[in-house]
Amino acid sequence: MKTDIEIAQSIELKPIVDVVEKLGISYDDLELYGKYKAKLSFDKIRAVESNPVGKLILVTAINPTPAGEGKSTLTIGLADALNKIGKKTMIAIREPSLGPVMGIKGGAAGGGYAQVLPMEDINLHFTGDMHAITTANNALSALIDNHLHQGNELEIDQRRILWKRVVDLNDRALRHVTVGLGGPLNGIPREDGFDITVASEIMAILCLATDIEDLKRRLANIVIGYRYDRTPVSVGDLQVEGALALILKDAIKPNLVQTIYGTPAFVHGGPFANIAHGCNSVLATTTALHLADYTVTEAGFGADLGAEKFLDIKTPNLPTSPDAVVIVATLRALKMNGGVAKDALTEENVEAVRAGFANLKRHVENIRKFGIPAVVAINEFVSDTEAEIAVLKELCASIDVPVELASVWADGAEGGVALAETVVKTIAENPANYKRLYDNALSVQEKIEKIVTEIYRGSKVNFEKKAQTQIAQIVQNGWDKLPICMAKTQYSFSDNPNALGAPENFEITIRELVPKLGAGFIVALTGDVMTMPGLPKRPAALNMDVESDGTVLGLF
């Protein structure tokens, strides 16, 4: 059995100019990064805005195992299958973060015969967007520290600076640092810290901005900290939004690549769904909707995180809402949610599938609350048994949700045809009637309680003293009408990563609220969610290498 990287390297890529020709995109519309990668020009993005809007398919998942359940793989395979059955389809997905690639995932460009290519480039430096975001973020940090050093005209309280530096790696040693040491020539000493780049507000802004002017407006709105009198200080107060936008002027343009089967794909932006909103860029998704009849996109982690944020935060910024939501389920994740230990997930256990179905059922119910039809995709693994698949199909039938087995990892486009046909049929026969979970006019507490009680099925929300103080400050500053972005473990509906399945009557504790005015939401932090991950005991980096001819080894 070939590895993902071996499959990717065996494919003869088409020039990206030829791949996108069928979408009406010409050579002059592209800014090429070699033969197989390109950015789409703003002139072309504006030119297609008058085109009809196609159908939107959102791919999400049940609460996952640590290895993930193959959402990206299913997204890519479904799009390939839709093209195979004659539907003009595009993909709009996130760019991988180098931290998890070097850490646990080893790659995040799909898998098997459902990959976006060139996968080595996409998983590593790609077109430099991550570096541009990192640079813009850290340029702001440098400008803040310089302002303090040069007399602090804005009277920024260095004890209340919210803005952190970032790096696109998992590096727990950088979570808490002290800067400005070494005497008066080296700045003002203060506590600081690093987040991973994908947790930066600038990443969220890039993924929500619609053009350069909107980018500058959002950058200016970033709250970097507070003055001695407790009033907020913004990037606009520092007058550096133009400089930051300049660094991002190319990064904001969507990246175009291809799948193994030649399906055009936007890969742009990459916020995590547990600590940010978990969706690719609005620009990429919107442009795909104007170029294709069907656009397949994804939202990070389980539907309790990524899909909720897609529907409550991203969708209001799109020209349409999803016409269907595909929920990816694997038998191994169902068994884990049914109480099976991680080292026994490959063993047949029909009763554990039955027990774990409660998790999938809740995700289906939640998607239906948004007025959107759901389809379950069983992402097939070699350890799956006929008995387990049969019982899962029986359970899905009991709640009247369409279900299809998908083998896109092993069989590519052909392995997703049944799923593609079911999704098209579902869209045709069950028109979506999208509605948001909550009204932004509700109070901060009420919006959080809506998410916790209706999506997670908790019974109560507790606000720690720090969070209560921050809510009062948010209200005082007039920020309380923004949507909520929950920062929560991806493994459970609750804030306890060990409470698997479908827990009920639990309490969730909000420990901190962080206003992200540039992004346009408030982050509510729960549990011990980290904005800078650490590496596992045996990071994927240990298996990576490059040969003398440049051949990449170990990405998977």
From Swiss-Prot:
Pathway membership: One-carbon metabolism; tetrahydrofolate interconversion
GO molecular function, one term: ATP binding
Listed Pfam families: FTHFS
SUPFAM superfamilies attached to this UniProt entry: P-loop containing nucleoside triphosphate hydrolases
Superkingdom of source: Bacteria
EC number(s) on file: 6.3.4.3
Keywords annotated in UniProt: ATP-binding, Ligase, Nucleotide-binding, One-carbon metabolism
Annotated InterPro entries: Formate_THF_ligase, Formate_THF_ligase_CS, P-loop_NTPase
Positions that bind ATP: 65-72
Protein name: Formate--tetrahydrofolate ligase
Organism: Streptococcus pneumoniae (strain JJA)
Gene from which this protein is expressed: fhs
